[in-house]
Regions:
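An N-terminal assembly and electron-transfer interface module characteristic of large anaerobic redox
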Residues: 1-416
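Non-catalytic accessory segments flanking P-loop/AAA+ NTPase cores
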Residues: 403-469
Length: 469
């Protein structure tokens, strides 16, 4: 019997192809898909992920029941190509799950009638969005590289990533550019996001390649024959990145000078927070992460490995089981959860006191401003600042404020607790985030006593306590 998938949060390779190819300035993507598949990827979700109202270089064939049930999609593909062909515009035809199900492989037809149009079999039914991005970038190199030998330009660096649909990419990309420049590198290309299609041939001429994400880009980087680094998270990784890049570019002294300057400027808030009273909270902070691989690994490494906070779980959202995540949230009650919209929904369903911090898709969020990085030195400061400010908010919310209450909310008379009920209450309070334990215990006790009164009892028992927990 097959496993039921709950709240699938990772898109298919069809989405990957659209998000990758449409990021190139001179490419127009033709999707062999129903109009709904166009609207969902190119209009609706694009506005939630990238704050882009729609993709201008994306057109569907608008498959109907006729094409899917009988005639196939070749005729409608040819009609759409005729409308879209224009000088300086490279058309790429992409398969969707629907066209793949009816076996619409247009490779042969295109070679006969439209040899300049390329066909990418997205494998929508077989791969997820990260596998699809990796293969799409490799495919571009195979199709459009000029096959000339590399002419390496000393001191130059190119970045692979991001595409559309990568969480928080404007801020992370800016931080990565800043680190490269500080280490003495001259940025050549950001592929595909700030590039044209044929820039693929120029990537091999860069002295160093930086892969921005652990999720994709490795396949293309491996074809270029250049030294490869990955975008860093946290203190140790960022230091190593700067020094290693400086060494590869023969600019080690420049990199060391930049690192020294960073300690006096960008990293100064980290040192101040570490020496301040806020640092006393750090060992008590319990957090969880559910995000794409780069963020899942990076946040755990920085917050647990370097800041001494307690990581209750860290999941790669492309591989994890959302039912298990919901259960883990319920059982472990993290103080902070870096996650996606499904995780935020689980918190609401469980009435959890956890502070939610967006860290991945799906989920509607605008991150076009450049001040919210997670990567590099700037990312460390932003994340730590968010956590400390959230702790201040929590303290405010847990103050014993005198609220106006309706009659019946304060239990009349004295309510007795059995020793077993008290023991269970203490155990439940211990599992709550440290900073909120007093407030959590007080609220749970109030609810239990109110329920006892409603039931006509003057005693809280273990059975009654479990009814409100």
């Amino acid at each position: 019997m097959g496993r039921t998938v709950r709240d699938e949060s990772t898109a298919s390779a069809y989405w990957a192809a659209v998000n990758t190819f449409c990021a190139l300035k001179d490419v127009h993507v033709l999707a062999d898909a129903p109009v709904g598949c166009y609207n969902l990827v190119g209009v609706a979700v694009m506005d939630y992920t990238d704050a882009v109202p729609y993709l201008e270089n994306f057109t569907p064939t608008s498959l109907t029941e006729k094409e899917i049930a009988s005639s196939g999609s070749s005729e409608i593909v040819r009609q759409t190509i005729e409308k879209l062909q224009a000088p300086g515009r490279q058309l790429i035809l992409v398969s969707s799950a629907e066209s793949e199900m009816i076996g619409s492989d247009h490779e042969r037809m295109l070679k006969m009638h439209y040899p300049e149009v390329r066909f990418f079999w997205s494998n929508s039914l077989g791969e997820n969005e990260w596998q699809g991005r990796d293969r799409a970038l490799k495919w571009i190199h195979e199709q459009f590289d000029d096959q000339k030998p590399a002419v390496v330009e000393p001191g130059t660096v190119s970045i692979i990533g991001p595409t559309y649909g990568c969480f928080n990419s404007p801020s992370d990309l800016l931080e990565l550019k800043r680190l490269i420049s500080g280490a003495g590198g001259e940025l050549r290309h950001v592929y595909p996001f700030e590039s044209s299609l044929n820039d693929i041939s120029a990537l091999k001429n860069s002295e160093v390649i930086v892969v921005m994400y652990r999720e994709f880009g490795e396949a293309l980087a491996g074809m270029l024959g250049r030294p490869v680094l990955h975008a860093p998270f946290g203190l140790a990784e960022t230091r190593e990145f700067i020094l290693e890049l400086g060494g590869l570019l023969n600019k080690r002294e420049r990199a060391e000078a930049f690192l020294k300057l960073e300690k006096q400027t960008t990293l100064k808030p980290l040192w101040d927070l570490w020496r301040g009273p806020q640092a006393e909270w750090f060992p008590t902070v319990r957090f969880g992460v559910t995000a794409a691989k780069s963020y899942a690994l990076g946040l755990k490494q920085f917050l647990e490995g370097e800041m001494g906070m307690q990581c209750l779980f860290s999941h790669n959202s492309a591989e994890t089981d959302n039912t298990l995540i919901r259960n883990e949230i319920k059982e472990k009650q993290p103080q902070f959860l870096f996650g996606r919209m499904p995780d935020k929904i689980y918190l609401a369903e469980l009435e959890a006191k956890t502070r939610f911090i967006p860290a991945g898709f799906p989920g509607p969020i605008v991150r076009r401003a450049l001040g919210t990085p997670f990567m590099g030195h700037s990312g460390m400061i932003y994340i730590l600042q968010e956590i400390v400010n959230a702790l201040y908010d929590m303290l405010f919310n847990f103050l014993p404020i005198n609220r106006r209450t309706s009659s019946g909310e304060v239990p009349p008379g004295k309510i007795v607790w059995t020793s077993q009920a008290n023991q269970i209450l203490n155990e439940m309070v211990k599992r709550a985030p440290f900073i909120s334990q007093i407030s959590f215990g007080r609220e749970l006790k109030r609810k239990a006593e109110l329920l006892a009164v409603k039931q006509g009892s003057d005693t809280v028992t273990p059975e009654l306590l479990k009814m409100v927990s």
